[in-house]
């Protein structure tokens, strides 16, 4: 499905801003010596706290991770059940310290999902 250029640019700019907010945490984190970077659950939780303060839904890829600001996602899904249009962005912090921006859009009939994944280059 083609993505509108405005939506695409908005997602890219949003991800750049989020990655810049996480940069200091990522740079200080112990990433090990392997070529496959893995940050600790503590680092992922620290990154989650930064986004939590922005009042957006955010989850980490750690097992049994809780979604911060889950009520925002619940509200969006409840409205979709009522056939009310809307959208929401969920962020997922991955083991490599990268961030996924998952945008869900409900148009009253269909649900669309746009995903953009960012990661740091060593």
Regions from the PLM with identified roles:
Residues 1-122:
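Mature, Sec-exported extracytoplasmic domains of Gram-positive
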């Amino acid at each position: 499905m083609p993505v509108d250029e405005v939506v695409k640019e908005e997602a890219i700019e949003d991800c750049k801003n989020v990655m810049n907010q996480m940069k200091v945490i990522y740079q200080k984190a112990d990433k090990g010596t392997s070529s496959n970077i893995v940050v600790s659950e503590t680092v992922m939780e620290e990154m989650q706290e930064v986004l939590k303060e922005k009042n957006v839904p955010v989850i980490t890829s750690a097992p049994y991770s809780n979604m911060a600001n889950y009520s925002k996602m619940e509200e969006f899904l409840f409205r979709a059940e009522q056939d009310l249009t809307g959208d929401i962005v969920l962020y997922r912090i991955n083991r490599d310290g990268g961030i996924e921006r998952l945008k869900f859009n409900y148009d009253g009939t269909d649900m669309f999902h746009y995903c953009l994944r960012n990661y740091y280059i060593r």
